[in-house]
Amino acid sequence: MIKKFTFPILIFCSFALLACNNSANSIEPSTVSSKKDNLEVHEKLNAKDQEIVNEYNQATDLITTGDVAGFHHQIKALIPQIKTISDDKQRNLILMNVYTQLEMNQDAFDLNEKLLKKNPSSDKQEFQCFLLKQLNKKEDLPTCYETAAGLLKKELSHPEAKKNPDYPYSQWSYYFYMYQAGHTEYKEKMLNLIQSTSDTKIKSNLQTAFDDEILNK
């Protein structure tokens, strides 16, 4: 799995979910993607689950009208029902969307912690670090980023990883995690990577990330 470039971190996912009964959204917590890009084959939800998903989707329509307060009110009221969805992936996805939209950071942290224990990934771990910042638990950040770096290093050890054109982003993310974990020598590694990158678009993106996440902090 190649780490997508996600700086600054955007924590909310696409609003519309499950427009069709036979589709599912597979967005990682720390990644923003369109519904179209994340559709995959999925067994049909049972009638009760689908009814709840439909209610959530209807609530998201308020965003298009600019009624953010109304949207927040409706999705908060739906939380007890969302928790009864039997499909694990859809329940967790929608709950995470709701928690992040309502800035229920402790609830998002607790849910993400459960997801990490079940299926660890650098994306989820990165999101956990973000939530620690939101919860003002800065003392836990070095360990969190160290763990994220370890997970990403394992993901990048797969033979196909370096063949992916997005590999420089993943490599930069690893250096960034290590820097955030307290290994200050990785600042120089980030700069060297930027300077050695030949692709102008990637180079520009990496430089912007460095400026935003390192220089301007």
Question: Residue locations for each model-derived region?
Answer:
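N-terminal leader/linker segments that initiate helical-solenoid repeat arrays
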Residues: 20-90
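Generic helix N-cap/helix-start motif at coil->alpha-helix transitions
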Residues: 45-60, 84-94, 119-127, 165-172, ...
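Terminal, low-structured helical/coil segments at or just beyond the last alpha-helical repeat
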Residues: 170-217
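Flexible helix-coil transition and linker loops at the boundaries of alpha-helical arrays
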Residues: 40-46, 79-89, 114-118, 150-165
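Sec-dependent bacterial lipoprotein signal peptides
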Residues: 1-18
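Structural motif corresponding to the intra-repeat A-B loop/turn of tetratricopeptide repeats
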Residues: 65, 102, 135, 180-183
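Alpha-helical repeat scaffolds
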Residues: 71-80, 105-116, 139-155, 183-197
